[in-house]
């Protein structure tokens, strides 16, 4: 790596390695070298220098993702280093910048997006600051600055991916809606919400600048029904939205909603009309919503072909599958999740027609708990064989034997771009007659030694085919989710409170009956 760094970057590293000297020398450093000083200080985790560099930033723009990405002076990509020490220093430096004399302020735009949360931090301290923590830090800093007596001046436009829960809701609202002049004006290209009430969600999204929002994730413990979704889309409006994720049961009817005698669903049709107004929408995730027979109504009006579609556990029927196989979206799909449906046994012709239509674009396919058994493997191989762009195949929770998996792996070696396979624990490793789909307890009770032997055999299949580039794994309880990991304590408390409320309501109902 040393031979790939430029002399300019080596010099920057040498300077930031001496924090006191670096801070004292900043005023004499050429403006075009500040980006190198920033990356060098971030790489070496010299938080004092990072703060000082931001405080005196001489350029009109600061774009974190671009600065940490590969460059001619330093090819290493640091965008997966969400180092707590460096990010805290960065935001403190941003505050220092707006607090200094107006004549010294140059910064107009601070783009804090473009970094990735990963499971293992490569920074020296090994301590990450996740998306929720970054949101909290920025919101608190904005609130503190709002209380400062500042000279008038143009505010710095801050772009940030926000993650809002009950725990940081108040601070975020204050940051987005300052009572007076605000030196930092937060804009939000991406927004994730969890553990909020529907009214809180509606309120904070109205403040977050929905007209510029590109990605909206409403997940887990935001209890929405179809009435809330319709209200959200109709009243707030997201003209530039490209990606939308809705939580479990988001398309369930409201408690007082009465369906029409002819079986039509005006509420769903209204939601579909609102979605059709989003001319840039290409990603839609509505997993764990009951959408039996409703996919044509929901997806039919969309004006733009979808590239990402998650319909896991949506209780799809033949009407839905037939629509998917023949709709305009099929030929554009890059990411598709149809987990929780017995596709091969119930809808073989439409499912494989869908795969054929998507074969030129499909990169990631997830078929977890789809009832795929040994007798289906031949058909599955035929269906996947045209998918030459497939990079990831995930099919956990299917009752397949070691023999069937070996056959499937042999065929998958023919897919030139495949890089990742998530395969189920072979049914040979479970007691005979084990039921599928499995709960978490049953799933975890298997013969580990036998699994290790079979997994080694499967890796040998790849090795013989010269496909060491394919990574294989069996993540029984799902892949790493940095957002859930970061907020697990708050989510647990939220669930306990919800359970307590449900028990109190049940007890109250029993007393009324008595």
From Swiss-Prot:
Superkingdom classification of source: Eukaryota
InterPro entries the UniProt entry points to: LRR_dom_sf, PRAME_domain
Keyword Repeat: yes
Keywords in alphabetical order: Leucine-rich repeat, Repeat
Transmembrane parts of this sequence: none
SUPFAM superfamilies attached to this UniProt entry: RNI-like
LRR repeats: 104-141, 185-209, 238-277, 278-302, 303-334, 335-350, 359-386, 387-411
Disulfides per UniProt: none
Family: Belongs to the PRAME family. LRRC14 subfamily.
The protein's name in its UniProt record: Leucine-rich repeat-containing protein 14B
Organism this protein belongs to: Homo sapiens (Human)
């Amino acid at each position: 790596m040393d031979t790939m760094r430029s002399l300019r970057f080596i010099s920057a590293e040498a300077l930031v390695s001496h924090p006191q000297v670096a801070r004292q020398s900043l005023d004499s450093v050429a403006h075009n070298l500040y980006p190198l000083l920033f990356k060098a200080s971030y790489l070496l985790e010299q938080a004092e220098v990072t703060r000082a560099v931001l405080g005196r930033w001489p350029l009109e723009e600061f774009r974190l993702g671009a600065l940490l990405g590969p460059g001619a002076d330093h090819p290493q990509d640091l965008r997966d280093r969400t180092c707590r020490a460096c990010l805290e220093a960065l935001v403190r430096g941003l505050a220092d910048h707006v607090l200094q004399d107006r004549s010294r302020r140059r910064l107009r735009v601070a783009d804090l997006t473009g970094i990735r949360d990963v499971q293992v931090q490569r920074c020296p301290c090994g301590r990450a600051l996740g998306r929720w923590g970054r949101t909290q830090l920025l919101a608190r800093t904005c609130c503190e600055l709002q209380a400062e007596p500042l000279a008038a001046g143009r505010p710095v436009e801050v772009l940030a991916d926000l993650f809002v829960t009950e725990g940081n809701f108040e601070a975020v609202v204050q940051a987005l809606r300052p009572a007076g002049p605000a030196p930092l004006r937060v804009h939000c290209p991406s927004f994730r919400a969890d553990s909020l009430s529907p009214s809180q969600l509606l309120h904070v999204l109205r403040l977050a600048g929905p007209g510029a929002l590109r990605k909206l994730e409403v997940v887990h413990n935001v209890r929405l029904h179809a009435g809330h979704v319709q209200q959200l889309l109709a009243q707030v409006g997201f003209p530039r939205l490209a990606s939308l994720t809705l939580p479990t049961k988001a398309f369930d009817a409201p408690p007082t909603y009465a369906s029409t005698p002819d079986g039509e669903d005006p509420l769903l049709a209204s939601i579909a009309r609102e979605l059709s107004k989003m001319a840039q929408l290409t990603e839609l995730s509505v997993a764990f919503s009951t959408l039996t027979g409703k996919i044509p109504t929901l997806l039919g009006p969309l004006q733009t072909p979808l590239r990402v579609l998650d319909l896991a556990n949506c209780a799809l029927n033949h009407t839905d599958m037939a629509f998917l196989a023949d709709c305009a979206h099929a030929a554009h799909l890059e990411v598709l999740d149809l987990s929780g449906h017995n596709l091969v046994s119930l809808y073989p012709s439409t499912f494989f027609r869908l795969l054929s239509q998507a074969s030129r674009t499909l990169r990631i396919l997830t078929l977890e708990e789809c009832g795929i058994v040994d007798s289906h493997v031949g058909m599955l191989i035929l269906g996947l064989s045209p998918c030459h762009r497939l990079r990831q195949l995930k099919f956990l929770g299917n009752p397949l034997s070691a023999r069937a998996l070996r056959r499937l792996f042999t065929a998958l070696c023919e897919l030139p771009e495949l890089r990742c396979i998530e395969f189920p624990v072979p049914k040979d490793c479970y007691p005979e007659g084990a039921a599928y789909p499995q709960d978490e307890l049953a799933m975890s009770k298997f013969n580990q030694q036998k699994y290790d032997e079979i997994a080694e055999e499967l890796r040998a299949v790849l090795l013989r085919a010269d496909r060491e580039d394919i990574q294989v794994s069996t993540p029984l309880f799902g892949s790493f989710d940095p957002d859930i990991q970061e907020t697990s304590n708050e989510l647990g408390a939220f669930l306990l409170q919800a359970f307590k409320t449900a028990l109190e309501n049940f007890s109250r109902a029993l007393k009324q009956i008595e």
